Amino acid sequence: MSSYANHQALAGLTLGKSTDYRDTYDASLLQGVPRSLNRDPLGLKADNLPFHGADIWTLYELSWLNAKGLPQVAVGHVELDYTSVNLIESKSFKLYLNSFNQTSFNNWDEVLKTLERDLSTCAQGKVSVALYRLDELEGQPIGHFNGTCIDDQDITIDNYEFTTDYLENATCGEKVVEETLVSHLLKSNCLITHQPDWGSIQIQYRGRQIDREKLLRYLVSFRHHNEFHEQCVERIFNDLLRFCQPEKLSVYARYTRRGGLDINPWRSNSDFVPSTTRLVRQ
């Protein structure tokens, strides 16, 4: 269990509780979770973070009424900056989006500006939103993470409790390499409900070569770990930076959809540009 799982800041969340669904606009449904909850135990301070990045959300179940009462549908793309005070709790985000369902807006731009305003207020940080008509995305190919997949290893694993022990002495030789490694075996659990979260992860770095078996064992050790998506990515970035000491590092995870939302956090200390094309499980 994470050291802050019972923190008072989490007590008021609707997550894990029975809730009523509202279909008229209500910004108060949004709930934030302080990023400091997981950053403080990692020694990460808001004024001296070792990374930049964003939490990228895809909104698949977004609908409202136009001025004449005709339902509208869109796919939304949201980017929440890493410097925001809070991350957005996903169940509250879903409930908030449902409140648009029977609400009339004059035009698409009003919807976009409403989303940006409410999300930035909840997160206490910078948020950008884009809305896409379905015909803009139809025929979009399924993407893939560029890099070498490390999953097909003939190894025995019998421990699924989170530990950084696998990263001890996990670099080999003195030669500096630059490579991108990918795993589709990332599985963690919701901090509150302990429901499984499934993801693919891309790790791009420059530095002494990281032992792929040790890295895979470390990633698999998240299997019983309870944290939100964004927190897991920051933990992985921090652990790799601490133990492997690469010159450059980027960590990007794309998680499968739940409640019409997928969350795709990335953190980097280089000029990394994340691909936003959905993966095969998304």
Curated annotation (Swiss-Prot):
Pfam families linked: QueF, QueF_N
Manganese as UniProt keyword: no
* The EC number(s) this enzyme carries: 1.7.1.13
User: Which annotated residues bind NADPH?
Assistant: 90-91, 258-259
Enzymatic class = oxidoreductase
* Cellular compartment(s): Cytoplasm
**Keyword vocabulary terms for this entry:** Cytoplasm, NADP, Oxidoreductase, Queuosine biosynthesis
Q: In which pathway does this enzyme or protein participate?
A: tRNA modification; tRNA-queuosine biosynthesis
Residues bound to substrate: 88-90, 229-230
- Swiss-Prot/TrEMBL GO biological process terms: queuosine biosynthetic process; tRNA modification
GO MF, one annotated term: preQ1 synthase activity
May I have one GO cellular component term? cytoplasm
Catalytic residues, chain numbering? 190, 197
Report the catalytic activity: 7-aminomethyl-7-carbaguanine + 2 NADP(+) = 7-cyano-7-deazaguanine + 2 NADPH + 3 H(+)
What family does this belong to? Belongs to the GTP cyclohydrolase I family. QueF type 2 subfamily.
Q: What does this protein do?
A: Catalyzes the NADPH-dependent reduction of 7-cyano-7-deazaguanine (preQ0) to 7-aminomethyl-7-deazaguanine (preQ1).
Quaternary state and interactors: Homodimer.
Kindly give the NCBIfam families that the UniProt entry links to this protein.
QueF
Q: Please report the name of this protein according to its UniProt entry.
A: NADPH-dependent 7-cyano-7-deazaguanine reductase
Tell me the organism: Shigella dysenteriae serotype 1 (strain Sd197)
- Report the gene name: queF
